[in-house]
């Protein structure tokens, strides 16, 4: 496949911090790097809005339906712009070196079942929010989790 016909990733993604009323945060382990993270993923097309991307990625990666009446998806109105790791830059158009990431929180009931996408993730765990922040590979992911007390209903 030549560069002209190749479909590149869109450098706009979401980060979704999934948490319970007791402020346990879901982390999932990546297949390719073995690192722990929250749900992340890029827009499928340029006109997909941030919330659509968040709902789709959560369902694809965890099997959790963010639109379920017992779940509460919240756009935290935060964006991170960062350099794309060199190991992943091949996924993007040659002139692209930075990604913009929109941060969401998703409140789910205690005991929400998790069904991973085995091609993307190998394991999952619920951790206290501070421990989850310490366990993340990505600095922007850790920073988002540390903001949970600011955005979670009732604080943390």
Where would I find each of the regions flagged by the language model?
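Acidic, metal-coordinating catalytic segment for phosphate/diphosphate chemistry
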Residues: 1-17, 93-94
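A short coil-to-beta-strand element that immediately follows conserved catalytic motifs
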Residues: 65-78
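NUDIX/MutT-family hydrolases
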Residues: 102-108, 113-146
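Short connector loops at helix/strand junctions that flank enzyme active sites
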Residues: 11, 38, 97-101
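Conserved Nudix-box catalytic region and its N-terminal flanking loop in Nudix hydrolases
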Residues: 20-66
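Active-site-adjacent beta-strand/loop module that shapes the phosphate/pyrophosphate-binding cleft
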Residues: 77-113
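Generic C-terminal helix-cap and adjacent flexible tail
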Residues: 150-156
